[in-house]
Amino acid sequence: MIGAKTRVAIVGGIGYIGSCFASFIKEQNDKLIVTVIDNNKNNHVIKLLKKIGIEFYFADLLDRHKLTEVIAAIQPDVVFHFAAKTSVSESVHNPLKYFDCNVIGTLNLISAISNLQKPIKLFFASSAAVYGQTTNSYISEEIVITETQATNPYGLSKFLDELILNAVAKNSQLQVVCLRFFNVAGAILPFGNFNGNTTLLIPNLVKAFLKQTPFFLYGNDYATKDGSCIRDYIHVYDICNAHFLLWKWLNDHRQIKFETFNLGSGIGTSNLEVIDIAKKVFYPSRLNLEIRPKRSWDPAILVANVAKAKQTFQFKITRNLKDMISDERNFYENFYNDAY
């Protein structure tokens, strides 16, 4: 049972997944006291959130003093931590930026939460990138991960965060759940991915169809069925619902100190298969596809084994890849430009 007056802090709540989640939980329980913390001053998203009764605090994870002040003012019972640098390619070229924001920033948040000296549930947005290159077709949480597996600094930063959170949770009043996201797509309208520089495949594919600009496919010579990367896609709605289900599950399992779960569909789809589905959504529009060399930091296959989530908190997928692409199209055609 989730109390009506529970105080919720969503860190990184102006971003894509954070803002969708803020909207989702207010829809589930309008009595929750929800506050968003972010260093992004996207006024359009802030206005959308305020319309549904969500407050906004400006704070940067790297400003430890300000972050501590904000957390103390909110006094959250539950914290959802979505804030991070997330571009794999940028992390390869600027690893220090990623360790600074994702690792030091998370440490600062843990410190601010710990200062409250009360029981707090912390849900951390991790990533499938922690698994790096693996020979397993369906990746389970039981796989032993080491720092040498990560194929990029982004994945390594998330792995280090998980290690830190596990160590802290053992001797604190925190209950921590790390959620390893696979490839998130779709929208919960009017919220979606307002990041104009996103590196995610589906938003860029949708924009290429709408604007009739080139779409770059990196690699068609992987050891896969059609030569392109295989990934696991999950709708942002199902990501949000999984967090809500897990929150209710954790309320009934107060002895749990630390857990990890994969969040994906459990279905592998190649980049070329994604393009084929998008062609059907956008028919008769054509795609200007350009093949570029594969990138060294991209694993050939990343697909989730989601058996643990299904068995533990009845996780299920409600939307498919066509839904994700259609929702992204609706978002970019009817809502995206409102922010600019």
From Swiss-Prot:
One of its GO terms (molecular function) is UDP-glucose 4-epimerase activity. Pfam families: Epimerase. Disulfide bonds: none annotated. Its cofactor is NAD(+). Its EC number is 5.1.3.2. Keywords: Carbohydrate metabolism, Galactose metabolism, Isomerase, NAD. Pathway: Carbohydrate metabolism; galactose metabolism. GO terms for biological process: galactose metabolic process. The active site is at 154 (proton acceptor). NAD(+) binds at residues 16-17, 37-42, 60-61, 82-86, 127, 154, 158, 182. It catalyses: UDP-alpha-D-glucose = UDP-alpha-D-galactose. Homodimer. Belongs to the NAD(P)-dependent epimerase/dehydratase family. NCBIfam families: galE (TIGR01179). This is UDP-glucose 4-epimerase. It comes from Mycoplasma genitalium (strain ATCC 33530 / DSM 19775 / NCTC 10195 / G37).
